[in-house]
Amino acid sequence: MSFVVIIPARYASTRLPGKPLVDINGKPMIVHVLERARESGADRIIVATDHEDVARAVEAAGGEVCMTRADHQSGTERLAEVVEKCAFSDDTVIVNVQGDEPMIPATIIRQVADNLAQRQVGMATLAVPIHNAEEAFNPNAVKVVLDAEGYALYFSRATIPWDRDRFAEGLETVGDNFLRHLGIYGYRAGFIRRYVNWQPSPLEHIEMLEQLRVLWYGEKIHVAVAQEVPGTGVDTPEDLERVRAEMR
């Protein structure tokens, strides 16, 4: 099955300036992500960046780069610029792998591409079970609830579904109904072209979750449980030190 991986790698980061180029055990982080993507069997891998230093690091590792504007409001908008510059056909399957996920398993990159290819929807993503209350109540862990066919009903930073009886009793354990969304997406190129022409939705602004725009406009997102749980992503200096230790 043919698919393309696009890795958005924005240079500016409030909490970790120059994030794509931070060193992890002798390599820039973006090169680690590129290597994981290569292991997925993708037909083509493109790093989308707004900074020449990132481009040079990727090219030195034998990777392909697409230079993009620096003013994009989201990773999906950056993807859309690449889709147009590369003139991908509308049915091309594209997987968006975040540039700050150096420990992402190649298996789940392939999984999200396969899931999308098997369904007549524009978008697919993955989730993992939540087993502890700390994560269930953490607003930085995005929760998702699904219908009987595995399509997203809603994504939220709130604790959904709300387990009325268990939480009313003050229990610190959670049941088997909680899923944490992973920030990996598969799209068809034609869907990306439509997405960027939609106005942002009120729910998207409230939750600060751009995938809610898709549900707002009546489109479906398929969500599968990931075959492997990815390692730590890098958002903060503390995350970076943790990843360095785990990858040592």
From Swiss-Prot:
Pathway per its UniProt entry is: Nucleotide-sugar biosynthesis; CMP-3-deoxy-D-manno-octulosonate biosynthesis; CMP-3-deoxy-D-manno-octulosonate from 3-deoxy-D-manno-octulosonate and CTP: step 1/1; Bacterial outer membrane biogenesis; lipopolysaccharide biosynthesis
User: Per its record, what are the GO molecular function terms?
Assistant: 3-deoxy-manno-octulosonate cytidylyltransferase activity
Q: Where in the cell is it found?
A: Cytoplasm
Top-level EC class: transferase
Could you confirm whether the keyword RNA-binding appears in this record? no
The protein's predominant localisation is: cytoplasm
Record's Gene3D superfamilies? Answer: Spore Coat Polysaccharide Biosynthesis Protein SpsA, Chain A (3.90.550.10)
Query: What is one process in the GO biological process aspect for this record?
Result: lipopolysaccharide biosynthetic process
Q: Which domain of life is it from?
A: Bacteria
The enzyme's E.C. designation = 2.7.7.38
Naming one, the record's GO cellular component terms include:
cytosol
Can you state which reaction this protein catalyses? 3-deoxy-alpha-D-manno-oct-2-ulosonate + CTP = CMP-3-deoxy-beta-D-manno-octulosonate + diphosphate
User: InterPro entries per the record?
Assistant: Cytidylyl_trans, KdsB, Nucleotide-diphossugar_trans
Alphabetically ordered keywords of this record: Cytoplasm, Lipopolysaccharide biosynthesis, Nucleotidyltransferase, Transferase
Its family remark reads: Belongs to the KdsB family.
Role of this protein = Activates KDO (a required 8-carbon sugar) for incorporation into bacterial lipopolysaccharide in Gram-negative bacteria.
Q: Which PANTHER family match?
A: 3-DEOXY-MANNO-OCTULOSONATE CYTIDYLYLTRANSFERASE, 3-DEOXY-MANNO-OCTULOSONATE CYTIDYLYLTRANSFERASE, MITOCHONDRIAL
Query: Can you name this protein?
Result: 3-deoxy-manno-octulosonate cytidylyltransferase
Originating species: Escherichia coli O139:H28 (strain E24377A / ETEC)
Query: What gene makes this protein?
Result: kdsB
